[in-house]
């Protein structure tokens, strides 16, 4: 092995297999870019992003960990969200959900 070399296993890595997903259309109605990280609770993103928020409670972007999606002013696009796993207990973000999601198993 060479110092700094990364060795990876062969094959395809599948993310979030078997998890519930939803696709929604999102538009940035603001005058500044908005960037959303991979694990941010989508329901609580910047209010300048226009979409059906109720559909997104308990979901985050279905993208690789540590990555993000950026919305330029006036830009709209469809994104895929994936449901949080585990106890579905959410704290922080914008403080709109502070605890276990209602109806979470």
From Swiss-Prot:
This is Urease subunit beta. Pathway: Nitrogen metabolism; urea degradation; CO(2) and NH(3) from urea (urease route): step 1/1. InterPro entries: Urease_beta-like (IPR002019), Urease_betasu_sf (IPR036461), Urease_subunit (IPR050069). Keywords: Cytoplasm, Hydrolase. Heterotrimer of UreA (gamma), UreB (beta) and UreC (alpha) subunits. Three heterotrimers associate to form the active enzyme. It catalyses: urea + 2 H2O + H(+) = hydrogencarbonate + 2 NH4(+). The gene is ureB. One of its GO terms (biological process) is urea catabolic process. It comes from Marinomonas sp. (strain MWYL1). NCBIfam families: PRK13203.1, urease_beta. Pfam families: Urease_beta. One of its GO terms (cellular component) is urease complex. It is an enzyme of class 3 (hydrolase). Its EC number is 3.5.1.5. The keyword Hydrolase applies. It comes from the Bacteria. PANTHER family: UREASE. It is found in: Cytoplasm.
């Amino acid at each position: 092995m060479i110092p700094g070399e990364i060795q990876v296993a062969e094959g395809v890595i599948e993310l979030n297999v078997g998890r519930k997903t939803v696709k929604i259309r999102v538009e940035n109605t603001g005058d500044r870019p908005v960037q959303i990280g991979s694990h941010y609770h989508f329901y609580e993103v910047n209010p300048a992003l226009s979409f059906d928020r109720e559909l997104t409670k308990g979901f985050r972007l279905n993208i690789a960990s540590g990555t993000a999606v950026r919305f330029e002013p006036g830009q709209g696009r469809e994104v895929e969200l994936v449901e949080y796993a585990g106890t579905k207990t959410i704290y922080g973000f914008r403080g709109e959900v502070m605890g276990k999601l209602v109806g979470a198993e």
